[in-house]
Amino acid sequence: MRRLALASLMALVVGCGLISSDVAEIKFNLPPRMYSFDSASFGVPAGISGEVPCGAGQIVTDCCNPPPPLPAPDCSANALTCEQNENGMNVCMAQANVSQSQTMNLGQDVQQLSGLTGLVSISIKRISYEVTVNTLDVDVPEVFLYLAPSGVTDPGDPSAKKFGTLPAISAMTTPAGDVVLESNSASVLESFTSNIQSPFTFIAATTLKVSHSPTGRIDMTITGQLAAKP
């Protein structure tokens, strides 16, 4: 009877907020992951050093097959299309799909979690980003973050799940802020971290459309704060 009364008293104390209900939480920093997008790897066809007007009434009507003596760009990797630029002019545009992946294993990478085994509940406090270097001479559109099983590096893989989004980044700027998380980000994270010792992949991806061969690179670091409950 005494034990029952004590248990009831403890439940009442917790319910009244005198003892935090998250006292068993282990808060920890998400191990930082750095992503570097270098213009040298974008695969933009050579020969578009500047904007090339295209379309009806222009010398170039097909961006991949300009008339001689203009040099023919290599469109085998990333085709050129005739599209409007920010000034409303039709110019030859190249689309570059850029992505990088990093492996993460919370059980090994986070010291506070090294002793945990079995099923663990991981919750998100915040996920943030910082651009540490940006010498790119073109704007970077939204960068999408995905979580995927270990070994998966393609954001287009059916097993890769969208997790969050970084806002567009202007050329030559180094912003920082919070990642905009997907509405189901908690369940996405849980699906890859319920077994704390299982590695998974963290992917960053974006699609650039450029009217000239870009130069420079951008380095971004993703970090944040999570919490674990055994």
Give the location of each predicted region:
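Post-signal peptide N-terminal segment of mature Sec-exported envelope proteins
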Residues: 25-44
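Post-signal-peptide N-terminal segment of Sec-exported extracytoplasmic proteins
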Residues: 38-73
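Short beta-strands within extracellular/lumenal beta-sheet-rich domains
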Residues: 91-118
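A short beta-strand element within beta-rich, extracytoplasmic domains
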Residues: 118-136, 220
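Extended, low-complexity, turn-rich repeat/linker tracts enriched in Gly/Pro/Ser/Thr and Asp/Glu
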Residues: 130-142, 210-214
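Short, surface-exposed beta-strand/strand-loop-strand elements in extracellular ectodomains
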Residues: 137-154
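Cysteine-clustered segments with highest specificity for TGF-beta superfamily mature ligands
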Residues: 167-223
